[in-house]
């Protein structure tokens, strides 16, 4: 067997244009976001040739997680529509209901939520996520959501909720109930945010994330790619994650599903959608910059080909939503997901990931087995 090579070393089969930059990086798998990537370095990652970027991302993924293993979540809307927020992409906003014609639904009975959670567990999900279209939960809503957390956890599932903004007391109540994850997306960059929503500020989103973090609940926070934002906005979003004291434990990288009747959906449908490869680049850069976070495929997956989804997993995604529906939009079918997992050789994760370790990988550019070493950034 050939000796291990560093992929940053020039050889007859590699393009050396990016050698200097690659040599400046490190993938010490024990690092957290304390090794901060600068905004300039994040931009350089986005500019890498796609194959180089995917190789770096997959190597980092294997140093932090078990190869070919994915975490499966199921998402249920426990209260749908009539949301007072004006998010320009969302069919649940009360501001767009005359155009989207979404049928609003009141809170689902606890027994029906538990039945859905049991079905999710039976089909292989390890985490059950519950979402409500609220600006924030009211005082009368808190006993309901606390009961849901306790009942779902009693089934042996991890729990996640997305209920809008939380204050410190609400976060503490959910933490005491045993909530494992709380989702509150940043959606996009600070500079583009005003093009997306006006009823909730960027800082309010960050405040909720801080309240969740301080309560001891794991943070789930991601974005939506393809809302008309620029690559600079995607760079800024990744950089925003690295400004946090600790990166989110779970990062959904959504691909916009343009919904007719929503301002952003109508604009994207008229002007054209973003390349799927740019979404895949965003996944890969997120994996490199947040090596120990779960990177989840969420909205938008239904429309992708098998090959496009395979590239997303190669880019370091290791989690996805399982089931035929997300909150209000369609999702890839369960039978389709089962078939795709078999074809890709992916297995469902039922336990915590292994400890980080150095893993030899096949250098896709030279054909030799090699150990990718990316350097520490300060």
Curated annotation (Swiss-Prot):
Disulfide bonding pattern of the chain: none
Q: Which residues cross the membrane?
A: none
Q: List its EC numbers.
A: 2.8.1.6
Q: Which SUPFAM superfamilies match?
A: Radical SAM enzymes
Cofactor(s) for this UniProt protein:
[4Fe-4S] cluster; [2Fe-2S] cluster
| Annotated positions binding [4Fe-4S] cluster | 83, 87, 90
Q: In which pathway does it act?
A: Cofactor biosynthesis; biotin biosynthesis; biotin from 7,8-diaminononanoate: step 2/2
Q: What are the binding positions for [2Fe-2S] cluster in this chain?
A: 129, 160, 220, 296
Entry's Gene Ontology molecular function annotations = 2 iron, 2 sulfur cluster binding; 4 iron, 4 sulfur cluster binding; biotin synthase activity; iron ion binding
Per its UniProt record, what SMART domains does this chain match?
Answer: BATS, Elp3
Protein family (similarity comment): Belongs to the radical SAM superfamily. Biotin synthase family.
Outline the subunit composition: Homodimer.
General function of this protein: Catalyzes the conversion of dethiobiotin (DTB) to biotin by the insertion of a sulfur atom into dethiobiotin via a radical-based mechanism.
PANTHER family named among the record's database cross-references = BIOTIN SYNTHASE (PTHR22976), BIOTIN SYNTHASE, MITOCHONDRIAL (PTHR22976:SF2)
The name under which this protein is listed is: Biotin synthase
Question: Which organism does this sequence originate in?
Answer: Psychrobacter arcticus (strain DSM 17307 / VKM B-2377 / 273-4)
Give the encoding gene's name: bioB
